[in-house]
Amino acid sequence: MLQRDAFIEEITKSLDKDKSIFFLSADFGAQALDELRKRFPSNFLHCGISEQAMLDVATGLALEGNKVFVYAMAPFLALRSLEQTKCGAGLMNLPISLISVGIGLGYADAGPTHYSTEDFACSRAI
């Protein structure tokens, strides 16, 4: 089983028990998310390819007392939305978990815009 699939399986189990969990995604093409999206339409939010806005939505949900998991490709989640992550989840110490796929050169075939060699360094600084 892929790590991603194991993670989604655990999120599904958690959502069965706790409706204060929200799963936000910028990855609309991931078939692995189909079952989660169908079973929990009120707790699964597809934010489109707009990672910065997705982090702002996550901040709002967390401020209302929810636990939020944010899922996207590493270069866009760690780098494009760095300011939102810092000011939302980081400075306010909110229960937002960032889950990324394609770390390092995981999507190297998509070109340099999809490289994520500095994602850990940026995220750890927060």
Where do the language-model regions lie?
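Thiamine diphosphate
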Residues: 1-126
